Design a protein with these regions (language model features):
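Non-catalytic accessory regions of SAM-dependent methyltransferases
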Residues: 1-34, 39-42, 46
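Short helix-capping segments at alpha-helix termini
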Residues: 19, 134-136, 158-162, 228, ...
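Conserved AdoMet
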Residues: 31-106
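Hydrophobic pocket-lining residues within nucleotide cofactor-binding pockets
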Residues: 34, 172, 265
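Conserved Class I SAM-dependent methyltransferase catalytic core
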Residues: 85, 212-274
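Conserved SAM/SAH cofactor-binding pocket of Class I
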Residues: 98-196, 219
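C-terminal beta-strand of the catalytic ATP-binding
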Residues: 187, 275-276
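Mobile active-site "lid"/loop adjacent to the S-adenosyl-L-methionine
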Residues: 187-216
Length: 276
């Protein structure tokens, strides 16, 4: 079967299963199995798939119809222009989380020697993206999941920045021995009531939180009062509906700080910024 014909059939199957990204998913899976860039796939529609290639592709499409994310099927997700290894042990990096990296980079000089703590590092995407852009910065990457830390280390090593990063197994800020200059965190913030099929494959510990999704955000804000250095900063990704409540909570804990909510490219309230 030609790849163009397989692609048409695959898109039909995915659409019939309400997969909104059907065309893109089929293209990504073809690129993955053929080990060719997407541009090659588009310019060579006449290529004939081998039997093994077609069997593999059909198996992947079947898994995709069951809502398994493409990132887990290919063990890859692009974030901040970098490719990261991901599997079911870590949250799949989202485009909106790039705002956390952007925000931190705007606040730090290129040759600065500040210390950053990335709490709930997961795949390490935030840590690695910052390390690639700020060569003098020291980063502490913390996670409560040992498998996640192993993946973060793997990704850091693939970009040659592992020596700049301290990987720490721990819960939130409990393992930070001295205050840090910046705390960054993309913690679980989805309320249990908002569980959806498309995120059912991702680790629940990395997605959901109690107290309407605010439990861990409130904990890290409370703990950070003794973990931030003078003139320190903290940037937390939030669930847009939480913006007002979490902002009030932050102001109560840091009455003299500059506290603001930053919006993402979709104009949704996405980042809580606290500057001492």
């Amino acid at each position: 079967m030609q790849i163009s014909n397989w692609q048409k059939e695959a898109v039909k199957v995915l659409i019939n299963h309400s997969i909104t990204s059907a065309a893109l998913d089929a293209e990504v899976l073809l690129s993955f199995v053929l080990k060719k860039p997407k541009e090659y796939i588009l310019s060579h529609p006449e290529i004939i798939l081998t039997k093994n290639q077609q069997v593999t592709l059909d198996r992947l499409i079947k898994k995709r119809t069951q809502s398994e994310p493409v990132a887990y099927l290919t063990n890859n997700k692009e974030f901040y222009g970098l490719d990261f290894y991901v599997d079911e042990n870590v949250l799949i990096p989202r485009p909106e989380t790039e705002l956390l990296v952007d925000t931190a980079l705007k606040e730090i000089n290129y040759d600065s020697t500040v210390t950053i703590a990335d709490i709930g590092t997961g795949s390490g995407c935030i840590t690695v993206a910052i390390a690639k852009n700020l060569p003098q910065t020291k980063i502490i990457a913390v996670d409560i999941s040992r498998p996640a830390l192993a993946i973060a280390k793997r990704n850091a090593k693939s970009y040659g920045v592992e020596k700049k990063i301290s990987f720490v197994y721990g819960d939130l800020l409990n393992k930070l021995k001295v205050p840090v200059d910046i705390i960054i965190a993309n913690l679980p913030y989805v309320p249990n009531s908002e569980a959806k099929k498309e995120i059912s494959f991702e680790p629940k510990i990395a997605v959901f939180a109690e107290n309407y999704g605010m439990e861990l955000l409130e904990k890290i804000i409370t703990q950070s009062k003794t973990k931030l250095s003078k003139n320190g900063m903290m940037f937390l990704e939030i669930h847009p509906p939480q913006a007002e409540k979490i902002s009030v909570f932050a102001k109560h804990n840091f009455p003299g700080a500059k506290i603001s909510i930053l919006k993402d490219l979709a104009n949704k309230e996405r980042i809580l910024s606290i500057k001492l």
